[in-house]
């Protein structure tokens, strides 16, 4: 979102932690369901000036709890608002409880599962897109296109919570930083991943670029999501065959 210079109206959930550095990705956070109302207010107050500059983010459980009426309000009042539903298929922030979108009751019994895409369309949203949050380039393309629409749109960013026991979350080979190629730019560190660390080490890499340190990946914490490799412009992050 920072890359696209968007004003992000946030909500209540694990993504609220993105308000703080190094992500600094959220600009407002008041209460559950407020993100969509805030984005709608900015759209009406700023008019065309807000087009392509504001996006609301809300988790799947929070959306089902108190975001549906906000989205309906956007459609009813013809707002040009893009809502990104961060769907990790659980109520992650408070202990990974089930909700109407998981297909299970709080007792763990199988039940009806709400389809978020169909729900958004039933409220009158014509443009509903699904993205994989682990494909940064695809997410950027979709968000850039949707925020420019002069009408409501919804982007569902779907991937299981990495702590989920029921669903298999993203899991690949752990990655490693090639110390000879790392330029020390810290782009990977700005992801806020707990597996990444900074090693103070003045010198130059094999390309002759001076640096004050380099990144390092703890293979035991890395789940192989590849986000760090995607943001590295120097090809310094690759698969690590050994733990």
Which residues does each PLM region occupy?
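Cofactor-pocket helix-loop regions in the catalytic cores of large enzyme subunits
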Residues: 1-20, 65
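Short glycine-rich anion-binding loops that position phosphate/pyrophosphate groups of nucleotides
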Residues: 14, 159-162
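Iron-sulfur cluster-binding cysteine motifs and their immediate structural context
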Residues: 183-216, 223, 227-243
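Thiamine diphosphate
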Residues: 19-156, 164-168
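Conserved helix-loop functional segments at active or binding sites
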Residues: 6, 14-17, 41-51, 194-202, ...
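Generic long, charged, amphipathic alpha-helical segments
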Residues: 44, 50, 174-181
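Active-site lining segments that contact anionic ligands and/or coordinate catalytic metals
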Residues: 5, 78-81, 125-128, 149-154, ...
């Amino acid at each position: 979102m920072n890359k696209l210079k968007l004003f992000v109206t946030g909500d209540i959930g694990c993504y609220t932690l993105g308000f703080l550095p190094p992500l600094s990705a959220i600009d407002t956070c008041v209460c559950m369901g407020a993100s969509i109302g805030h984005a709608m207010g900015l759209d009406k107050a700023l008019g065309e000036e807000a087009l392509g500059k504001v996006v609301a983010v809300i988790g799947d459980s929070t959306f089902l709890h108190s975001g549906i009426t906000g989205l309906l309000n956007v459609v009813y009042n013809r707002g040009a608002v893009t809502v990104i539903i961060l769907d990790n298929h659980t109520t992650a922030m408070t202990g990974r409880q089930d909700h109407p979108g998981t297909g299970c009751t709080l007792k763990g019994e199988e039940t009806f599962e709400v389809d978020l895409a169909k729900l958004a369309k039933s409220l009158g949203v014509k443009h509903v897109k699904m993205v994989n949050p682990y494909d940064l380039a695809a997410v950027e393309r979709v968000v850039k296109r949707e925020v420019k629409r002069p009408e409501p749109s919804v982007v569902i960013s779907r991937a299981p919570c990495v702590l989920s026991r029921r669903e298999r979350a993203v899991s690949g080979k752990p990655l490693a930083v090639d110390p000879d190629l790392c330029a020390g730019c810290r782009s990977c560190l700005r992801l806020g991943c707990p597996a990444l660390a900074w090693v103070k080490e003045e010198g130059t890499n094999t390309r002759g670029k001076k640096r004050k340190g380099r990144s390092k990946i703890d293979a035991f914490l890395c789940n192989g999501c590849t986000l760090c490799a995607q943001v590295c412009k120097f090809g310094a992050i690759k698969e690590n065959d050994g733990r």
